[in-house]
Amino acid sequence: FPRNLFHTLDFTHEDLNKVNGSFKTGIAKEGWGKKGKAFIHNFPPPNVAYHFNAVMLQDYILSILKNKVKVVENNISSNELDANFIMDCSGKPKTLEKFDISSYIPVNSVHVTQCDWDYPRFQYTLTVARPYGWVFAIPLQDRCSVGYLYNKDINTLEDVKKDVNYIFDK
């Protein structure tokens, strides 16, 4: 993604400030596998990825490409458009009749919260196995975005919120 941003928009590492971004040098895993074993999957040098505020990145891209991009916010089929490139941001399929994968996915809900800070405390995506599911933490410049994925048919949101507080206290 950083290479694509650079080649299409001349987006540099310095532009990360404009989208509240931070460098991502790997993925840390805690509590997965053997008890007490944590590890970081580092990206080999010089590879790096980005964490960024998605809304700010969207605004940045649209401001750079305002005269080159037409945003269509409507329910249309791709054959109704004459375009070189189409990005479908509609999310899940309109009908889920043939798209039910719930029996394959053990989590079906997420609780997202933020913790404010004045600078990123780490340069990787943090993933932590927890009793009710798993947690991701994404560091941005002014905050850390934390999501707790769990199964709402087995656990309660209250239990998940208490466990998130335990993680913050750690």
Regions found by a protein language model. Name each.
Residues 1-37:
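N-terminal FAD cofactor-binding segment of flavoenzymes
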Residues 13-14, 32-33, 50, 134, ...:
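Tryptophan-centered motif/residue detector
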Residues 17-24, 47-52, 101, 127, ...:
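Short, charged/polar micro-motifs that form catalytic or ligand-binding hotspots
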Residues 24, 169-170:
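Flavin (FAD/FMN) cofactor-binding core of flavoprotein oxidoreductases
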Residues 28-68:
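Mobile amphipathic helical/loop "lid" adjacent to a hydrophobic cofactor/ligand pocket
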Residues 59-168:
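Predominantly flavin-linked oxidoreductase catalytic cores and closely associated redox partners
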